[in-house]
């Protein structure tokens, strides 16, 4: 978007100052004298304040406002041109009407009375027609009156004018041209004698452009070309011209670099700018030394805390309206609504910047004014000695045109600002280099945790389903996003097959898919008599035109061969899953997996993988990537069972959703023709949310005026030393001669061979799953190998059969290289890296001076879990500083990990109970259309859905009392009519549509939910969640039994046995000698060790791992008043789903003195934790005035104590090269914005929490966390709001880190 788009947002204002004034140019000798005086004044001044305008950005390709090709100047010229054209067309049409009414009379009509009543004066056209009538078109044009040639007008010959009109498509013909064209073809006049006046000639504005143009780095401009310049596409500054570029692609000029370097050297104390292009901040962030009095088109401001964020994308609103973003630093969960900071004509200056500008203007002894005419008030008042400037101060103005302050300034220089800035840079030995970098933030999380990622993905409207209707009807989920269609359980969907086209960001269709809903009957234990009710599954097929083979009827059903105790002997009886079409690489059908529903037809997320062993080995993971500078992403697959799905969720913010089941490489195209290779590391054994932030250079500039650089044209001749087929990973994996064959996915032979080998691949992977015990210590993707050397002999035979088939891709494979193709061979040892960008895989597109830095990319930050590894062993820890997250973020992080960890226990004796979260989520939920949460467009969607009707206008508090169905406030102007009403969160105000109490009571009875639990608070939506029991095995977690006896449950297998009355868990020891049933309600619980609600009558039992003892030998009877507690001290093993923690103590018969001593220490630590949590929650509070270093030191000292109450301890590590913004830790009190969109009275502040919402959510999350830990084997019904908050955590963390780096 150019500056013209910004100017069109402004309201109409007639007076904009003088437009298109004459420009002046200094002589060379006089300019040298003035520049020398300027440099001496800069050296001698003590307090310099810079006043900058739009003139310093014209060399960057941005238009000014009052220059020769300024925005307002072009508007004024266009208005005059249109006005003249309308007047000319009106007169011309009037003449034509009169000429058509003229009837040439015969001599017999001359006696009529009408002939004598004609006017004496006739038009010349009538005379010509009359002469042509009588003289038979032989008219002497020399009889016409001679034309008067005005000395001040510009005339051209007729032929030249016709040539110019044909070349320029400019049909502004004047009256003389119309007269000549009306003569006809029988014309014998001298055309050279006819002079035609040039209307709106550009030479009248700039007469010397074609004569005195500077030819350095500029194409030669012809006279005709200068006359044909489109002022909206080119900007003219001085004697130069440059093509207009977009605002987000503009690079800093030499003037911006000079100001930034002088601020770094403390020569310039303060800067007051009228520009909205943020080029000053692109050089470096100096919020406390900069006053943007007119706002910034890239900046958002939180309406709750006042923090400002510098975005890489343009803000679409003006006059402090909500943008759709939320502030993640002032509160977690986010509560602050972000607005723009652009001023309209009717808006006054922000008080913070206005007071700062007055303060520094009064102190300054030198006012350095650059590129502004100062016709806007009060911007012109700051350097004026008649207003705020000191009377004894010195002032200098550098501008081509005369300014409003020309009469009172001490030094006027009419010259190019960049030329003078270049001299200053050399005199003060400044660094002229400016680096434009892109920040790429990546989050990796398990696939089943993003059922509800954002409303652009999932929006469910008018879905009313009861208990059994969900599984009885075929529903086309791909059409649920359409708001105009309503689905219920009484209607069948007529369209069973839906074709979806995939388009990239440039609008090119690159893939076609069709989706179908399938109904499968599931027969457990190979018994055809019993079957589970029908399950609706989304079935994905990729159809290719060259193959029309239909093998859908030959699909094999998935059979569970898992019996209670006899499945160990039936490992090889697993049936192969279906590969539905010979042309389909990724065809799949599922029974037990999760599926996703999208608002639009998003087939990338509407798929279910099959339950074959190959899929279990290659489970998928989700990567969320955000970077507004990304243009396109490309990738390839190494094997047929590798899957990569890429979807652009938000085009403005650059939010990408990537789902894959292997480590893949992405070729990412950025702005300025820059390219990178991004490697996404797949690690299925990692249940945590991991984050990496990278800083990549995309452009280098020295402020040179490089003209007409096309940022959008894709140059095919760009020479980058890497691509998807030739890079460091590929060269280490294969020879270059076979790389192209590996990635030729469009080859029909490869596809057909791949589809024919799918069954063999499934068989081999089944064999691998039966022997995973030998491969536990391998790398993540080494479990994907079909040819595993540790397999049994029977499996080796099967694998050898597949080697010959797999040689289609690679002919030079031998027995020593039997692994599948992957990128994990060069993985780094840093397990906290979920991605990788090498310096060799970065191509900087805009580098006119061929600058070669040592490092073009570096990791900016990463999120690590301290509980899983020792931080002292981190080699790169010295280059990073710790930034502790808030307690509410840590608490939600722990809940997320507990609930969403994949249960990878490979116990063949247990029945795999499938659970589809989204299935139950849809079945029990009835969404309102206004339930849009945490998305970029949620405000706009709510505004569009708002129905005003005949609703009277009244203020916020009256509206809150009278209407209870929403939580809203009026817009900025309550008195103006026609304003849209902004609806605030109805999420936290419990304003959802309520269900009937009978349905809720049935759910409570079914799932045994108590009234004290937090998840039945709202009593409208519930969600079923099963706690991952394997996550509770931690050193701060203990087993508790509320009976009078203790049982050793080590090395026992749990089997859930369904009964009519209650659920029982059968505990078998290792030798199957004893069997004990424990009630789920009373006996089996676990709680964290450090909690405030520890009761004295609690009975603790330590979980230990002893392979030699049985359960009957370790039974101890204790009284209610006895207290047993055992501390675990052995180091933690590598984390996975069934790791357990050993202990130094092999029995529970410890002395009571030591136990009481440990109890007292825990109670003391609890008190300390309360104070530390209080300090940590105040970290992001507005009243917190701590510095960066002090805060980090305190967090480092108190980190261990603060996190003892949680299982996991996430910490963000930030590279020391990057300095966080000033507003991250400290916000001046007078920066507070107006209280318009955030309900301050409802959400007040206190000392411990930033607002009451954070306190409320923290308390509810705390209660939920305690319930999950205390009852590990219990199935819970969680409120829909809490479930959405848990599902949104990866998206929240992504935005939290992004706001952390964009904060000014």
UniProtKB/Swiss-Prot annotation:
Q: Which residues bind NAD(+)?
A: 53-72, 274-277, 371-373, 399-401, 417
What residues does the Deacetylase sirtuin-type domain cover? 28-466
Lineage: superkingdom: Eukaryota
Task: Tell me the segments the record calls region Disordered.
Answer: 545-585, 749-827, 1154-1203
Q: Which E.C. number(s) belong to this protein?
A: 2.3.1.286
Entries under PROSITE patterns matching the protein:
SIRTUIN
* Residues at the active site: 294 (proton acceptor)
Q: Which cofactor does it need?
A: Zn(2+)
Question: Which positions in this protein are listed as binding Zn(2+)?
Answer: 302, 305, 327, 330
CC cofactor note: Binds 1 zinc ion per subunit.
Q: Show which residues constitute the signal peptide.
A: none
UniProt entry tagged with the keyword Lyase:
no
| InterPro entries assigned | DHS-like_NAD/FAD-binding_dom, Sirtuin, Ssirtuin_cat_dom
**Annotated Low complexity bias:** 548-585, 756-806, 1182-1203
Q: Which reaction does it catalyse?
A: N(6)-acetyl-L-lysyl-[protein] + NAD(+) + H2O = 2''-O-acetyl-ADP-D-ribose + nicotinamide + L-lysyl-[protein]
**Alphabetical list of Gene3D superfamilies matching this protein:** 2.20.28.200, TPP-binding domain
The entry lists its GO molecular-function terms as: metal ion binding; NAD+ binding; NAD-dependent protein lysine deacetylase activity
**Swiss-Prot/TrEMBL keywords:** Metal-binding, NAD, Transferase, Zinc
Q: Record keywords: Transferase included?
A: yes
Q: Name one GO biological process term.
A: regulation of DNA-templated transcription
User: What does this gene product do?
Assistant: Regulates the expression of the surface antigen-coding var genes central to the malaria pathogenesis. Cooperates with Sir2A to mediate silencing and mutual exclusive expression of only 1 of the 60 subtelomeric var genes at a time, coding for functionally different but epitopically variant versions of the erythrocyte membrane protein 1 (PfEMP1) molecule, to evade the detection by host immune surveillance.
The UniProt similarity line reads:
Belongs to the sirtuin family. Class IV subfamily.
Q: Which PANTHER family match?
A: GATA ZINC FINGER DOMAIN-CONTAINING PROTEIN 4-RELATED (PTHR36911:SF3), LIM ZINC-BINDING DOMAIN-CONTAINING PROTEIN-RELATED (PTHR36911)
Protein's name according to its UniProt entry:
NAD-dependent protein deacetylase Sir2B
């Amino acid at each position: 978007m150019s500056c013209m788009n910004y100017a069109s947002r402004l309201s109409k204002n007639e007076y904009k100052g003088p437009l298109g004034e004459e420009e002046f140019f200094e002589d060379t000798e006089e300019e040298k004298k003035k520049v020398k005086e300027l440099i001496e004044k800069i050296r001698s001044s003590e307090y310099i304040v810079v006043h900058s305008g739009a003139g310093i950005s014209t060399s960057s390709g941005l238009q000014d406002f009052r220059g020769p090709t300024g925005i307002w100047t072009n508007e004024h010229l266009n208005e005059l041109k249109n006005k003249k054209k309308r007047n000319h067309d009106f007169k011309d049409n009037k003449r034509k009407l009169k000429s058509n009414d003229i009837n040439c009379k015969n001599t017999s009509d001359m006696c009529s009375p009408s002939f004598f009543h004609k006017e004496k004066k006739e038009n010349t056209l009538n005379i010509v027609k009359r002469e042509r009538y009588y003289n038979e078109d032989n008219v002497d044009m020399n009889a016409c009156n001679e034309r008067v040639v005005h000395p001040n007008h510009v005339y051209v010959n007729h032929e030249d004018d016709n040539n110019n009109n044909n070349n320029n498509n400019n049909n502004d013909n004047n009256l003389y041209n119309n007269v000549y064209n009306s003569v006809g073809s029988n014309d014998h006049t001298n055309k050279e004698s006819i002079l035609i006046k040039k209307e709106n000639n550009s030479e009248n504005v700039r007469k010397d452009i074609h004569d005195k143009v500077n030819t350095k780095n500029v194409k030669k401009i012809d006279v005709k070309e200068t006359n044909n310049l489109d002022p909206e596409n080119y900007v003219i500054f001085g004697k130069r011209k440059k093509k207009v570029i977009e605002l987000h692609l503009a690079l800093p000029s030499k003037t911006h670099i000079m100001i930034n370097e002088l601020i770094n050297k403390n020569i310039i104390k303060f800067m007051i700018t009228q520009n909205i292009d943020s080029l000053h901040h692109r050089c470096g962030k100096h919020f406390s030394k900069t006053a943007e009095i007119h706002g910034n088109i890239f900046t958002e401001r939180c309406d709750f805390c006042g923090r400002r964020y510098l975005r890489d994308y343009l803000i679409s609103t003006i006059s402090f309206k909500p943008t759709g973003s939320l502030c993640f630093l002032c509160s977690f969960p986010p509560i602050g609504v972000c607005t723009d900071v652009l001023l309209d004509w009717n808006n006054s200056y922000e008080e913070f910047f206005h007071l700062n500008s007055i303060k520094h203007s009064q102190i300054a002894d030198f006012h350095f004014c650059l590129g502004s005419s100062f016709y806007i008030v009060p911007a012109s008042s700051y350097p004026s000695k008649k207003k705020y400037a000191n009377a004894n101060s010195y002032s200098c103005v550098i501008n081509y045109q005369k300014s409003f302050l020309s009469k009172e300034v001490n030094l006027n220089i009419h010259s190019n600002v960049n030329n003078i800035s270049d001299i200053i840079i050399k005199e003060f030995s400044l660094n002229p280099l400016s680096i434009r970098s892109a920040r790429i933030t990546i989050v990796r999380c398990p696939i089943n945790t993003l059922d509800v990622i954002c409303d652009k993905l999932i929006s469910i409207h008018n879905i009313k389903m009861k208990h059994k209707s969900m599984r009885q009807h075929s529903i086309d989920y791909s059409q649920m996003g359409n708001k105009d269609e309503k689905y219920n359980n009484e209607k069948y969907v007529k369209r069973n097959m839906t074709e979806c086209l995939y388009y990239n960001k440039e609008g090119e269709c690159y893939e076609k898919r069709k989706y179908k809903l399938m109904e499968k009957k599931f027969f457990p234990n190979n018994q055809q008599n019993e079957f589970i009710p029908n399950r609706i599954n989304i079935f994905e097929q990729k159809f290719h035109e060259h193959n029309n083979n239909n093998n859908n009827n030959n699909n094999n059903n998935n059979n569970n061969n898992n019996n209670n105790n006899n499945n160990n002997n039936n490992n090889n009886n697993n049936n192969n899953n279906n590969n539905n079409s010979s042309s389909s690489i990724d065809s799949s059908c599922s029974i037990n997996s999760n599926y996703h529903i999208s608002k639009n037809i998003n087939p990338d997320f509407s798929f279910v993988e099959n339950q074959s062993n190959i899929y279990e080995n290659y489970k998928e993971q989700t990567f969320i990537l955000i970077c507004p500078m990304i243009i396109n992403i490309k990738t390839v697959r190494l094997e047929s069972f590798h899957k990569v799905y890429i979807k652009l969720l938000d085009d403005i913010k650059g939010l990408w959703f990537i789902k894959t089941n292997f480590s893949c490489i992405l070729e990412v195209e950025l702005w300025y023709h820059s390219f990178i290779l991004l490697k996404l590391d797949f690690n299925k054994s990692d249940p945590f949310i991991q984050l990496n932030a990278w800083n990549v250079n995309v452009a280098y500039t020295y402020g040179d005026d490089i003209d007409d650089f096309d940022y959008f044209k894709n140059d095919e001749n760009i020479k980058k030393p890497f691509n998807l087929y030739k890079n460091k990973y590929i060269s280490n994996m294969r020879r270059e001669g076979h790389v192209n064959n590996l990635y030729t996915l469009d080859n029909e032979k490869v596809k057909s061979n791949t589809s024919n080998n799918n069954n063999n691949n499934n068989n081999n992977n089944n064999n691998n799953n039966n022997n995973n015990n030998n491969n536990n210590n391998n790398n993540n993707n080494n479990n994907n190998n079909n040819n595993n050397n540790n397999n049994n002999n029977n499996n080796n035979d099967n694998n050898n059969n597949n080697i010959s088939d797999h040689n289609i891709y690679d002919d030079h494979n031998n027995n020593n290289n039997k692994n599948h193709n992957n990128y994990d061979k060069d993985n780094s040892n840093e397990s906290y890296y979920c991605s990788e960008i090498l310096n060799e895989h970065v191509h900087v597109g805009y580098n006119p001076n061929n600058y070669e830095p040592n490092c073009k990319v570096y990791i900016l930050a990463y999120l690590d879990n301290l509980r899983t590894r020792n931080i002292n062993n981190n080699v790169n820890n010295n280059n990073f500083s710790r930034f502790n997250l808030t307690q509410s973020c840590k608490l939600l992080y722990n809940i997320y990990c507990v609930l969403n960890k994949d249960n990878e226990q490979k116990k063949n004796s247990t029945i795999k109970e499938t659970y589809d979260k989204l299935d139950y989520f849809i079945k029990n939920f009835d969404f309102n259309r206004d339930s849009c949460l945490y998305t970029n467009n949620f405000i706009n969607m709510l505004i569009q859905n708002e129905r005003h009707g005949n609703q009277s206008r009244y203020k916020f508090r009256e509206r809150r009392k009278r209407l209870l169905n929403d939580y809203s406030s009026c817009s900025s102007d309550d008195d103006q009519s026609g304003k849209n009403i902004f609806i605030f969160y109805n999420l936290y105000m419990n304003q959802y549509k309520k269900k009937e109490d009978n349905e809720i009571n049935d759910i409570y009875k079914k799932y045994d939910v108590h009234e004290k639990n937090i998840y039945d608070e709202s009593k409208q939506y519930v969600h079923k969640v099963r706690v991952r029991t394997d996550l509770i095995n931690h050193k701060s977690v203990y087993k508790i039994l509320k009976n009078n006896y203790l049982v050793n449950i080590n090395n026992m297998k749990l089997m859930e046995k369904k009964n009519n009355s209650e659920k029982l868990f059968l505990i078998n020891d290792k030798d199957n000698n004893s069997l004990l049933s424990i009630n789920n309600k009373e006996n089996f619980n676990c709680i964290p060790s450090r909690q405030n609600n520890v009761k004295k009558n609690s009975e603790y039992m330590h979980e230990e791992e002893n392979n030699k003892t049985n359960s009957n030998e370790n039974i101890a009877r204790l009284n209610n008043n006895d207290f047993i507690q055992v501390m675990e001290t052995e180091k933690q093993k590598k984390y996975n789903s069934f790791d357990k923690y050993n202990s130094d103590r092999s029995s529970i018969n410890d002395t009571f003195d030591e136990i009481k001593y440990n109890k007292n220490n825990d109670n003391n630590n609890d008190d300390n934790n309360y104070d530390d949590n209080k300090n940590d929650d105040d970290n992001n509070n507005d009243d917190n005035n701590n510095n960066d270093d002090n805060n980090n030191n305190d967090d480092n000292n108190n980190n261990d104590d603060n996190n003892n109450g949680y299982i996991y301890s996430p910490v963000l590590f930030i590279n020391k090269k990057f300095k966080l913004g000033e507003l991250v830790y400290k916000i001046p009190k007078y920066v507070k914005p107006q209280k318009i969109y955030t309900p301050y009275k409802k959400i007040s502040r206190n000392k411990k929490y930033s607002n009451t919402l954070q306190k409320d959510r923290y308390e509810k999350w705390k209660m939920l966390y305690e319930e999950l830990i205390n009852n590990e084997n219990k199935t819970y019904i969680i409120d829909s709001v809490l479930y959405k908050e848990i599902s949104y955590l990866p998206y929240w963390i992504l935005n939290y880190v992004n706001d952390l780096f964009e904060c000014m």
